[in-house]
UniProtKB/Swiss-Prot annotation:
<feature type="disulfide bond">
    <location>
        <begin position="78"/>
        <end position="106"/>
    </location>
</feature>
<keyword id="KW-0732">Signal</keyword>
<keyword id="KW-0186">Copper</keyword>
<feature type="domain" description="Phytocyanin">
    <location>
        <begin position="25"/>
        <end position="124"/>
    </location>
</feature>
<dbReference type="GO" id="GO:0046872">
    <property type="term" value="F:metal ion binding"/>
</dbReference>
<dbReference type="InterPro" id="IPR008972">
    <property type="entry name" value="Cupredoxin"/>
</dbReference>
<keyword id="KW-0325">Glycoprotein</keyword>
<dbReference type="GO" id="GO:0009055">
    <property type="term" value="F:electron transfer activity"/>
</dbReference>
<dbReference type="GO" id="GO:0005886">
    <property type="term" value="C:plasma membrane"/>
</dbReference>
<dbReference type="InterPro" id="IPR028871">
    <property type="entry name" value="BlueCu_1_BS"/>
</dbReference>
<keyword id="KW-0249">Electron transport</keyword>
<feature type="signal peptide">
    <location>
        <begin position="1"/>
        <end position="24"/>
    </location>
</feature>
<dbReference type="InterPro" id="IPR003245">
    <property type="entry name" value="Phytocyanin_dom"/>
</dbReference>
<dbReference type="Pfam" id="PF02298">
    <property type="entry name" value="Cu_bind_like"/>
</dbReference>
<feature type="compositionally biased region" description="Low complexity">
    <location>
        <begin position="127"/>
        <end position="160"/>
    </location>
</feature>
<keyword id="KW-0813">Transport</keyword>
<feature type="binding site">
    <location>
        <position position="65"/>
    </location>
    <ligand>
        <name>Cu cation</name>
    </ligand>
</feature>
């Protein structure tokens, strides 16, 4: 009986360890509209809290736009010549690996000045419930940042079909809850 309980406990811990990394949120920039000229990305970001471990997915026409992560000064001036990273494949995923301000623009001339720019503040941990911060994309004015060079890597993914929400994080929590409940009821019975 002790061996059986130990085995169930090990299984429970393995399930929890596999589920925890999946609790990060994947945000589709612009929701169903995607990364387009004329999008209001300041409003889009205003009700979201970004945390280290989350990801941004930019969906756009391959070759028609780019996603460039830039420094704050390049964000304000809509300059992509010194981009930290750039991608133009049509489906760009940016993992948020570092806390602080992150700035994104479309590097195609005229697109950033037409509204294709996004500024977000990434929190160190997803456990906090403080309000999100976003710099308005139309004014180009933002508060100074002590960290002008956010570290991020650009990877590409195949676009995924999004339903009503741009963020996905509830189902892993629900799955974890039911798995733990089932295992606990098995151990206690």
């Amino acid at each position: 009986m002790a061996f059986s309980n130990a085995l169930v406990l090990c299984f429970l811990l393995a399930i929890i360890n596999m589920a925890l990394p999946s609790l990060a949120t994947v945000y589709t920039v612009g929701d169903t509209s995607g990364w387009v000229i004329g999008g209001d990305y300041s409003t889009w970001a205003s009700d979201k809290t970004f945390a280290v471990g989350d990801s941004l997915v930019f969906n756009y026409g391959a070759g028609a736009h780019t996603v460039d992560e830039v420094k704050e000064s390049d964000y304000k001036s809509c300059t992509s010549g010194n981009s930290i990273s750039t991608d133009s494949t049509g489906a760009t995923t940016i993992p948020l690996k570092k806390a602080g301000k992150h700035y994104f623009i479309c590097g195609v001339p005229g697109h950033s000045t037409g509204g294709m720019k996004l500024s977000i503040k990434v929190k160190a941990s997803s456990g906090s419930s403080a309000a999100p911060s976003a710099t308005p994309s139309s004014s180009g004015k933002g508060s100074p940042s002590s960290d002008d060079t956010p570290a991020a890597t650009t990877t590409t993914t195949t676009p995924t079909k999004q339903n009503e929400s741009s963020a996905t994080s509830l189902s892993p929590i629900v799955a974890l809850f039911f798995t733990v409940s089932w295992i606990c009821s098995y151990v206690l019975v």
